[in-house]
Amino acid sequence: VRINAMAASLSDKLEAKQVQQSEAVFKEHVSDIQPGAEEWGLTYRNSFPKAYPGSIHKLEAAARVVSTGGTRSVRDKTTLVIRGADQVLVLVDIRPLYDPDAPKMDQMKASLGALPADYAGLLAAHAKIHGELFNRMRLDIGGGADHQRTTEELLEASTYDNPNRALIEKEFDAGRYNIISCTGELPPTLQGCWGGTYVPGWASDFTQNGNVPSAIAANMMGNMPELMLAYTR
């Protein structure tokens, strides 16, 4: 692969600035970071120093790491090293803590330990739940054979005056897929897969001037009313 040297230098400079800005915002909002490793898997804890009363004060995460073949060892109680494995399955549980004095780590480890180490079975169960939600409705405005074309081709063929119908249908499906994937105990805050960053300008909070409403807009029209409970209850 050949890369233009000037373009690469400019790209590196821009990326370095973005990293510095991201790191500064991250340190302002995230503290007391505690990674951990043991033979069973990985753990993580952090605090949110700018948490509002009644909001999320801490975060805890546990990852059960199941490896087949090879060797594994723990280094410095922070790193799990796996070498020569035929397969590695990672089961993750992440919990936001509203009460900083009520940890969930033991509960997460127990729930992860009870899961079968069967990727195909876990995926099938997951796909069944998401598939039932996703297939409750379908938008058909005549996209037809254009669904066989790539998104890039559809974007090129679409104009403001004459938008491609298959592109509209795909965008509608993408919005429903995203909200299904991002909704849990809480609705998404337009970070991560929505905004391309974990430190957006609105501090990753639940901004009501359009961010959260835009994310959950597909719930009712997509016939997924139970997903609204993450926002209303």
Map each language-model feature to its residues.
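Aromatic-residue-lined binding/catalytic grooves and analogous aromatic/hydrophobic interfacial grooves
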Residues: V1-R233
